[in-house]
Amino acid sequence: MGIICLIIGLAILMIMCMKGIHIFISVFTTSLFLAVTAWLVSPDMLNPVDALLQVYTGGLGGYFGSFFFIFVLGAIFGKLTAISGAADSVASFIIGKFGERAVIPSLVAACAILAYGGVSVFVALFTVYSMMVSLFRKANLPRRLIPAVYFAGAGTFVMIMPGSPQIQNLIPMKFLGTSATAGLVPGMLTALFQITLVIIYLTWLFKRVKAKGEGWVEDEKTAKAEEGKKDRQLPNVLVALFPMLILLVVLNILKWDPAIALFCAIIAALIVYLRYLDWKKLVPNLAAGTMEGVTSLFNTAVIVGFGALVMTLPAFKESFQAIAQSGLNPLVVTAISVGALVFISGSGSGALSIAMPMIAAMFPATVVDQGSLHRVATMASMSTTPPFNGLIITVFSVCGVSHKEGYGPVGTLTLAIPLLAMMFMLLLYTFLPASIATM
């Protein structure tokens, strides 16, 4: 009964998200439903009030506090690149040098390089967002596809590649004693397979959009911003890129905290963009950037709180145990259990943190190659991303796009294609010689 209630709750949440209902209302309604039904099924569990006030708010508040400066400073940095004309400068350079056809490949490559270089996917979003808006506007592409292009670069093949510094590739190391390049050959072949599918899909998608005559539409906010940009001198492209390079150097070479790296980038931007900023409007613009960051953070934190609540439900634990004890091949068990946890909790890293201790205990090195287990677990954590995933919520919020407008392409890139890639990886481990598969 508890599992049925959990499935109904997830269905309610997905339907409300797709209908465009505000994420907090959607999540709170679903959380209340799950808390009440779980209490009715298992009276010894926390009562609904405590479940919401302790577990849910604990997850929400913990995430809000941990990521506050990353979101706020990231939004301020993005605002500075926009109001200074730096983002427009980079966009004009790309369009001028390579033409409109290079817009999508350039953005996908930029996002992928940032993510594989170790930049948090949240920080990467704020780094490239203003540039993406400028490029989409100049190329007359619809705003609703900005999230799809971002995920194509930062949220698909890069996240599962051997050597990636993203958290999904690092968590299994802690429990399996493996390295970041574990499962090198199957991992790289799967990443190549996924890249191919992403390119094919994006090519088809943008041809279809162009054929339908769909293009950039200014809303009132962006129209006013564009009006103020006319006849404005733009910074040289090297000047425009300098603060972004500072961010990458401080984050990836000096290995400083992401919040400190963003702060350094903001200081660099204020210095090198000095002559391009309207200082009378600077404080209001920074205040607007701050509020945009807080809004995005809150929208993400509410779904993290939901994940924390779901993970305490007896039905959640029963589901995992049933999969883990099914007697299937260890790699298949890992793929199914981690994938199911991701879809239920809405978090790839959260699912890995829960699943890996149990998987490591059930499948030691004497049973299965630990590098193979690592690579399958990482792939599985990115193969069943639900519509209520925290990063998806954040990207839509920052881009000003609703689920109804943008989830179709994003769902293809973060759910359909990764599922195919997961199956491809399992086939590789089935048919490749052991000497190659375990490299």
Listing of model-derived features with the role each one plays in the protein:
Residues 1-3, 61-67, 94-109, 138-146, ...:
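Membrane-interfacial loop-to-helix junctions in multi-pass transporters
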Residues 75, 89-91, 122-135, 164-176, ...:
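Re-entrant/interfacial helical elements at transmembrane boundaries that shape
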Residues 3-6, 10, 38, 42, ...:
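Long, contiguous bundles of hydrophobic transmembrane helices that form the permeation core
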Residues 134-234, 369, 373-379, 390-429, ...:
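Membrane-core helix-loop-helix motifs of multi-pass transport proteins
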Residues 20-23, 64-67, 78-88, 115-127, ...:
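Short helix-coil transition sites and intra-membrane helix breaks within transmembrane domains
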Residues 5-17, 28-38, 71-76, 110-115, ...:
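Hydrophobic core segments of alpha-helical transmembrane domains in multi-pass membrane transport
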